[in-house]
């Protein structure tokens, strides 16, 4: 079952690679999506199971907010009830069920119907386990060692069933190339400018305000900042935090540019026009795909030492700074240092491109299939339906 935008991104990679290799029969349960339905026409190894939201479901989501923030138990989501019935009719005995996103405890009835040993939870971020989670899932897929180890601190799950499935990018799109001079000029950057790029949601956890503080400590007018993103995915609405960022940036004048939301399909061009990509996350980052995409495009990366970030950047020669009381000071020092050492940036670029190749969609698919065989080996001689 899949309900999140990030889930869809990974699901597309999985479906595309499975159409090429044909090692699995996939049944994807999701809310109705006309665009996805059109794209699914002609698939040989994947079937889409669209389950509409039942009436009254809007009253459920405020309860989910209370559960996540204050521990107040939410009732059973009626959407999952419909998924359970649809699965029973469509595929009476699935070999394996992978829960993607949403509230993972909502799969309890599905687990009881098909068996805990057929159920895997795909953890996209830090997740605290509970007795209920342990009762529902016989295994997990974690985006990084950090996410896996953090989950196991509160779980009784056997470590051998806690799998690592690193995220992936489209390595055919995120590749090195020349900067788009017209795009760079349209954003107000001169050829001699040193452009630092931030890409992500504009919220405090992402640390963009600390990067702006770092820019305030840098007085070279040629060092500039490009901020790509918005407070909400795919939207351009204002937020109180964005207004604060814009006020903070006023002191820097034309050294800061805001683009608003940019679709992922256009991001390679933005990465390539930058001289340095900064990921100043202040919380535990599950994976850090922005950094991987930037490396794929040959851009050196400066990031905070958070969550799974060091794991994903291992071998890339990326510069990592600690999340202490002087994040802005560390960032400004690192930016100036990299600005003054183009030879070091070139080495980081070469190493980063090589590192990014580890996160291809083909590798993601092969790892997924390997996990399916390992986790479900006791249920079948060879995997078929997931």
Task: Mark where each language-model region is.
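Short alpha-helical donor nucleotide-sugar binding micro-motif in glycosyltransferases
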Residues: 261, 269-274
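Nucleotide-activated donor-binding/catalytic signature segment of Leloir-type glycosyltransferases, i.e.
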Residues: 114, 239-261
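Conserved donor-binding/catalytic core segment of Leloir-type glycosyltransferases
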Residues: 190-206, 212-215, 225-228
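Short hydrophobic beta-strand element within catalytic cores of glycosyltransferases
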Residues: 300-303, 320
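Carbohydrate-associated surface elements
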Residues: 146, 168
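Glycosyltransferase donor-sugar binding loop
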Residues: 224-243
């Amino acid at each position: 079952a899949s309900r999140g935008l990030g889930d869809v991104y990974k699901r597309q990679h999985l479906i595309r690679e499975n159409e090429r290799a044909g090692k699995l029969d996939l049944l994807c349960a999701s809310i109705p999506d006309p665009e996805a339905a059109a794209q699914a026409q002609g698939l040989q190894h994947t079937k889409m199971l669209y389950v509409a939201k039942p009436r009254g479901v809007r009253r459920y989501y405020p309860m989910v907010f209370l559960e996540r923030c204050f521990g107040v138990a939410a009732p059973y989501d009626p959407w999952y009830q419909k998924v359970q019935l649809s699965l029973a009719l469509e595929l009476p005995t699935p070999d394996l069920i992978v829960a993607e996103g949403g509230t993972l405890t909502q799969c309890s009835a599905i687990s009881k119907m098909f068996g805990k040993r057929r159920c895997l939870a795909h953890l996209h971020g830090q997740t605290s386990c509970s007795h209920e989670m342990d009762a529902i899932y016989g295994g997990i897929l974690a985006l990084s060692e950090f996410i896996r180890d953090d989950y196991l601190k509160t779980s009784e799950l056997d470590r051998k069933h806690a799998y690592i499935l690193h995220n992936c990018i489209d390595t055919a799109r995120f590749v090195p190339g020349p900067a788009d001079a017209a795009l760079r000029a349209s954003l107000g950057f001169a050829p001699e400018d040193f452009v630092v790029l931030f890409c992500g949601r504009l919220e405090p956890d992402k640390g963009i305000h600390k990067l702006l503080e770092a820019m305030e400590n840098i007085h070279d007018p040629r060092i500039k900042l490009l901020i790509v993103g918005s407070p909400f995915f795919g939207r351009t609405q204002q937020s109180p935090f964005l207004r604060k960022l814009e006020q903070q940036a006023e002191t820097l004048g034309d050294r800061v540019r805001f683009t608003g939301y940019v679709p992922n399909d256009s991001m390679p061009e933005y990465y390539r026009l930058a001289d340095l990509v900064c990921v100043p996350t202040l919380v535990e980052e599950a994976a850090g795909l922005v950094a991987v995409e930037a490396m794929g495009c040959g851009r050196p990366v400066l990031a905070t030492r958070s969550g799974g970030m060091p794991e994903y950047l291992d071998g890339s020669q990326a510069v990592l700074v600690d999340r202490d009381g002087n994040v802005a000071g560390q960032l400004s020092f690192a930016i100036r240092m990299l600005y003054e050492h183009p030879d070091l940036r070139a080495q980081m670029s070469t190493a980063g491109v090589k590192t990014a190749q580890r996160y291809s969609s083909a590798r993601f698919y092969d790892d997924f299939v390997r996990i399916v065989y390992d986790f479900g080996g006791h249920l079948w001689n060879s995997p078929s339906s997931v």
